[in-house]
UniProtKB/Swiss-Prot annotation:
It comes from the Bacteria. Belongs to the UPF0304 family. This is UPF0304 protein YPO2563/y1624/YP_2374. InterPro entries: UPF0304_YfbU (IPR005587), YfbU_alpha-helical_sf (IPR023146), YfbU_helix-hairpin_sf (IPR023145). It comes from Yersinia pestis. Gene3D superfamilies: Helix hairpin bin, yfbu gene product, domain 2.
Length: 164
């Protein structure tokens, strides 16, 4: 990320204000402030990720993943015979903060800002699954989208989806 000294000063001041406005993430903002002030090239690349772009297709895929989990929860709730299905297995875990931070950020935006899927339990880590989930969700989506009644899933269909 190439910035003039004036741009770096402005961004540094923004991070300083954020430490005061958001004490929970103050340490992260202090670190970013130091990186910007001192112009550490390697770490400045990290900031590029914060200002990255997410394609419309990726956004739609994440919404589809969240909608699939909503359908799983609705279907599970409607089952008369739950068989061996564990309710925790149908919960939406989110994405891995270390490797899927953009996806995680979009989920948090959808829930906290847009007010969608607020019934999902964000857990103690705010939808940070702490393990990569993208590939698993893709397999689950493929099975869910092939089901004829996506919001009236049988126990067998739910099991197939969560075991994908």
């Amino acid at each position: 990320m190439d910035m003039t000294n004036a741009q770096r000063l402005i961004l540094s001041n923004q991070y300083k204000m954020m430490t005061m406005l958001d004490p929970e993430n103050a340490e992260r903002y202090r670190r970013q402030q130091t990186i910007v002030e001192r112009g550490f090239g390697l770490q400045m690349r990290e900031l590029d990720r914060d200002f990255g772009e997410m394609s419309e297709d990726t956004c739609r895929t994440i919404i589809n993943i969240m909608e699939m989990h909503h359908a799983l929860q609705v279907s599970w709730g409607n089952l008369k015979e739950k068989q061996d299905l564990d309710e925790r297995r149908i919960s939406f875990l989110g994405f891995d903060a270390a490797t899927e931070s953009r996806y995680l950020s979009y989920v948090r935006f959808m829930v906290n800002t847009e007010g969608r899927y607020t019934h999902f339990d964000s857990g103690t880590h705010g939808f940070n699954s702490q393990t990569p989930m993208w590939d698993k969700y893709q397999r689950m989506l493929a099975i869910w989208q092939s089901c004829p009644r996506q919001y009236h899933l049988s126990a067998v269909e739910i099991s197939q989806i969560i075991n994908a």
